[in-house]
Amino acid sequence: CDRRFSRSDELTRHIRIHTGQKPFQCRICMRNFSRSDHLTTHIRTHTGEKPFACDICGRKFARSDERKRHTKIHLRQKDKKVEKAASVSATSSSVAAYSSSVATSYSSSIATTYPSSVRTVYSSPASSSYPSPAHTTFPSPSIATTYSSGTATFQTQVATSFPSPGVTNNFSSQVTSALSDMTSTFSPRTIEIC
């Protein structure tokens, strides 16, 4: 052929393609190769040697081109995660905007009877030394409307009348607490017990 090479070893290697000469032989299975690097790679199939490790997951490979192909899998996975995170971010911001508009559309009396999961701090119109307990989770207003108003009113009255130990307070009572009305009639010792 008319190909030219700048180095003699490249010419020698190329001539073996035309002649079919394979001077490098595996001593284990007697298979012949035209290039020494191909023999070296082949011997790894017998020894199990895998000197090329993936920098991301640590998986090992006998050939560098296998590692390179494998690394592309991680790059595709990374691209998918970035795309997914971007779509989740866009979705969560639109949900947050919807939630805040829904939370502001209810009047304060309905919000007291049917609290939403949106965390809101209400200041009490009346001073009270016994704040009402805060609930960590509430049903959404649409779910709460399935309960009868008598039940919801009873639950609200119970929640605002009796403090619960160990519960963090995020809401101040809009209703004057029953305990605050009774503090003047109890002695300090009785108040500590309650």
UniProtKB/Swiss-Prot annotation:
Gene Ontology molecular function:
DNA binding; DNA-binding transcription factor activity; DNA-binding transcription factor activity, RNA polymerase II-specific; double-stranded methylated DNA binding; hemi-methylated DNA-binding; histone acetyltransferase binding; promoter-specific chromatin binding; RNA polymerase II cis-regulatory region sequence-specific DNA binding
Give the record's keywords alphabetically: Activator, Biological rhythms, Cytoplasm, DNA-binding, Metal-binding, Nucleus, Repeat, Transcription, Transcription regulation, Zinc, Zinc-finger
The protein's site described by Interaction with DNA is found at R3, R7, R13, R31, R35, R59, R63, R69
Record's superkingdom? Answer: Eukaryota
Tell me the GO BP annotations in alphabetical order: cellular response to interleukin-8; circadian regulation of gene expression; interleukin-1-mediated signaling pathway; positive regulation of DNA-templated transcription; positive regulation of transcription by RNA polymerase II; regulation of protein sumoylation; regulation of transcription by RNA polymerase II; transcription by RNA polymerase II
Which PROSITE patterns does its entry note?
ZINC_FINGER_C2H2_1 (PS00028), ZINC_FINGER_C2H2_2 (PS50157)
Q: What cellular component terms from Gene Ontology apply here?
A: cytoplasm; nucleoplasm; nucleus
Enumerate the residue ranges forming zinc fingers (C2H2-type): 1-18, 24-46, 52-74
UniProt cross-references to Gene3D superfamilies, sorted A to Z? Classic Zinc Finger
SMART domains named among the record's database cross-references: ZnF_C2H2
Q: Where is this chain's protein located in or outside the cell? A: Nucleus; Cytoplasm
Q: Where is this protein chiefly located?
A: nucleus
Task: Extract the InterPro entries matched here.
Answer: EGR1_C (IPR021839), Znf_C2H2_sf (IPR036236), Znf_C2H2_type (IPR013087)
Recorded hits in Pfam families, A to Z, give:
DUF3432 (PF11914), zf-C2H2 (PF00096)
Q: Which family does it belong to?
A: Belongs to the EGR C2H2-type zinc-finger protein family.
Tell me the function of this protein.
Transcriptional regulator. Recognizes and binds to the DNA sequence 5'-GCG(T/G)GGGCG-3'(EGR-site) in the promoter region of target genes. Binds double-stranded target DNA, irrespective of the cytosine methylation status. Regulates the transcription of numerous target genes, and thereby plays an important role in regulating the response to growth factors, DNA damage, and ischemia. Plays a role in the regulation of cell survival, proliferation and cell death. Mediates responses to ischemia and hypoxia; regulates the expression of proteins that are involved in inflammatory processes.
Q: What is known of its domains?
A: Binds to DNA motifs with the sequence 5'-GCG(T/G)GGGCG-3' via its C2H2-type zinc fingers. The first, most N-terminal zinc finger binds to the 3'-GCG motif, the middle zinc finger interacts with the central TGG motif, and the C-terminal zinc finger binds to the 5'-GCG motif. Binds double-stranded target DNA, irrespective of the cytosine methylation status. Has reduced affinity for target DNA where the cytosines have been oxidized to 5-hydroxymethylcytosine. Does not bind target DNA where the cytosines have been oxidized to 5-formylcytosine or 5-carboxylcytosine.
Q: Please identify the protein, giving its name as recorded.
A: Early growth response protein 1
Q: Which organism is it from?
A: Gallus gallus
- Read off the lineage from the record: Eukaryota, Metazoa, Chordata, Craniata, Vertebrata
